[in-house]
Amino acid sequence: VAQVNHLPAPGETVGDASFMQSLGGKGANQAVAAARLGGSVTFITSLGNDMYAEILKKHFKKEGITTDYIIDDVNQPTGTALIFVADSGENCIAVAPGANYSLLPGSIIHFSKVIDEADIIVMQAEIPYETIKRIALLAKQKGKKVLFNPAPACLIDEELMKAIDILVVN
């Protein structure tokens, strides 16, 4: 996160920024929050072939999150967001999804047991839409609750909408 007096205009360089790195991502933040509230959390995601993947795995384990189903994508970096926040509170964000987009619909078969054991499936839109849809439909078929936060904003087709029990919008 770069804190700046004002957001740079196209072609402008703002030289007054302060910078900090933090762990996160919508899915990661949801997993950590659920674990801190006492939930038994298994996090299914895809991380890249870089130091951030190892840092995140250690962080998740420290938070009590099961990491057995994290995919290691050796061909992509871990997903990253570049965030600028102006003193006014206005922000702009660029997401480089990297390994997030490696969580493909065909990989869901490997996670069927986790879905069987879950009480609720929590997802957001930083993974491929077809993966979200496949997981939601499978979870619904198994009688599981599905919570979906469509952020970043995305269109939700009728079939997916019918599989969602809780829709989080902001």
Regions found by a protein language model. Give the residues of each.
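Glycine-rich phosphate/adenosyl-contacting loop at the front of the ribokinase-like
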Residues: V1-S46, M51-I65
